[in-house]
Amino acid sequence: MIIDRIEEQERYYPLHPDMELAFAFLAEAPDLEPGRYELENGLFATVSEGDTRQMDTVSLEAHKKYIDLQYCIAGGERMSWAHIQELNATTDDPEHDNYFYTGTSTSVSIRPGMFYVMFPSDGHKAACHHEFQKHYRKVCLLYTSPSP
């Protein structure tokens, strides 16, 4: 898992061949309408806005085929993370590359200008809150994880 500010993006370009392409899309995202966007090399992104969900009502999820990069454009959210080896698997949806878990996780506040990257070993909850609901605008970008 990576959490950082968008200004630090260049340090992550060497991690994946499509990382620079992903960040280039994020530069355009604040002006885009909500919806799904198809990019080069099989990357796709969803620009969305809404209200955060109560943290304890959301399951942890992970993806086996994709790396998940999420960027907060406006508002804010809390996200939660745990390594999947420390979690209990509950439901698999391989058709949509979603795998759900329960267990203890660590949460952090995500503010505008911050991004986080979740790898296949990272269980996560996104767009959540503990006490007070917030409105957010964000981008979720998925790109293929290199084969192990």
Model-derived segments and their meaning:
Residues 67, 71-77, 94-97:
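Glycine- and acidic-residue-biased ligand/ion/polar-headgroup-sensing regions
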Residues 143-148:
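Conserved small/polar residues in nucleotide/adenosyl-binding loops
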Residues 91-103:
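Non-DNA-binding regulatory cores of transcription-related proteins
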Residues 110-123:
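Conserved metal-binding segment of the jelly-roll/cupin
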Residues 46-61, 78, 82-86:
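Conserved short histidine dyad/triad with adjacent acidic residue
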Residues 67-71, 107-108, 115:
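His/acidic/aromatic-lined binding-pocket segments of jelly-roll/cupin-type domains
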Residues 1-34, 38-39:
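Surface/interface-facing alpha-helical segments and adjacent flexible terminal/loop regions used
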Residues 79-80, 108, 124-131:
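Short beta-strand His + acidic residue motifs that chelate non-heme Fe in jelly-roll/DSBH
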